[in-house]
Amino acid sequence: MKITPKPTCAIAYSIQQLGDKWSLLIMRDLVLHKKTRFKELRESKEKIASNILANRLKSLQVNGFIEKLDPTGTKKSTQYIATKKGISSLPIIIELYLFSIHSIDESILDESQKSIKKQIISNRTLFEETRKSEYISFVSSLKEDLNKFKLLAQLN
């Protein structure tokens, strides 16, 4: 078993939780792009390997950043959503975006990324609050649909 040293400060703690190469990209895909399924996350442009994705999802779940929804107990029905703690990583994602925004070659950005860049530069606070609100509504709707599905399954 790997022994992880206890963090010595708040920044070390945060890096221990989210500082690997993949965790913030997974949180980005969940919160900004509303991806919920393993396959959707695996197919992101960064091409994360399946074993690494599974490991990071488990770590994010254990650390309270995401919740695993599994209505039928099958891999195909499994979805991942950000928790309140996970949604709180959005400002970190935005700050990293702002940190790199002036040095990134815009030709590598797709239309969605260019739109996000424009919105963040225009009004970062509005962008952040709108995205949080949209994601919370999305998750509420998803959970409502899953509850209906479970209820129908019980009736049959």
What are these model-derived regions, one by one?
Residues 9-49:
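N-terminal helix-turn-helix DNA-binding core of bacterial DNA-binding proteins
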Residues 1-9:
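A detector for short, charged/polar N-terminal pre-domain segments
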Residues 91-156:
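C-terminal regulatory/oligomerization modules of transcriptional regulators
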Residues 44-75:
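Canonical helix-turn-helix DNA-binding module
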Residues 19, 72-96:
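Basic, amphipathic "hinge/linker" alpha-helix immediately C-terminal to the N-terminal HTH DNA-binding motif
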Residues 5, 14-17, 29-30, 64-70, ...:
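Short, contiguous, well-ordered secondary-structure segments
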Residues 34, 64, 100-104:
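A general structural signal marking secondary-structure boundaries and capping sites
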Residues 39, 58, 78:
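Residues within the helices of the helix-turn-helix
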